[in-house]
A protein has these predicted regions:
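Residues in flexible loops and secondary-structure boundaries
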Residues: 9-12, 61
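N-terminal signal peptide c-region/cleavage motif recognized by signal peptidases
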Residues: 13-18
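Sequence context surrounding c-type heme c attachment/ligation sites in exported
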Residues: 19-141
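Sec-dependent signal peptide recognition
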Residues: 1-9
Length: 141
């Protein structure tokens, strides 16, 4: 049974990538692990921001956006070994999208800091546009 399960997992993973036209960004294993952990953290943060906006806590949502996603977070991996730092191993266009994502979070934070709920809601889709663009264009596996 274990062999059958393993074969099915392999078959489905090969089939899943067969139609995947995204560019493979081959990163060293430690950098890939760092990036995947960061992406999961970003999803949790986006969910937190959405919850705060819905609750009417737009200023707090902006603070979270800057603290966890904004330009102030750039370079957070600088103390890791080079092989564990995703940025230097990314294709240049992928790295540019990552920078745009940080910049978008900072721009969203500035809008949210005004406390204007309507403007914050209007800015919300820009918060993850670079994320979506990057995930549509690149994969690490």
């Amino acid at each position: 049974m274990k062999a059958l399960t393993s074969a099915l997992v392999l078959l489905f993973s090969v089939a899943a990538h067969a139609g995947d036209a995204r560019q493979l960004a081959k990163l060293p294993a430690p950098a890939e692990a760092t990036l995947r952990e960061e992406m999961l953290d970003n999803l949790v943060t986006l969910n937190e921001i959405l919850g705060l906006v819905v609750a009417g806590k737009v200023k707090e949502a902006g603070e979270v956006a800057e603290k966890k996603l904004g330009t102030s977070t750039m370079g957070r991996h600088r103390n890791k070994p080079f092989e564990a730092r995703p940025g230097p191993h990314m294709p240049p266009a992928m790295h540019e999208l990552a920078m745009k994502g940080h910049q978008a979070a900072t721009a969203f934070a500035a809008v949210a800091a005004t406390g204007d709920r309507e403007k914050t809601l209007a800015a919300l889709p820009t918060l993850n546009s670079a994320c979506v663009s990057c995930h549509l264009a690149y994969r690490v596996r």
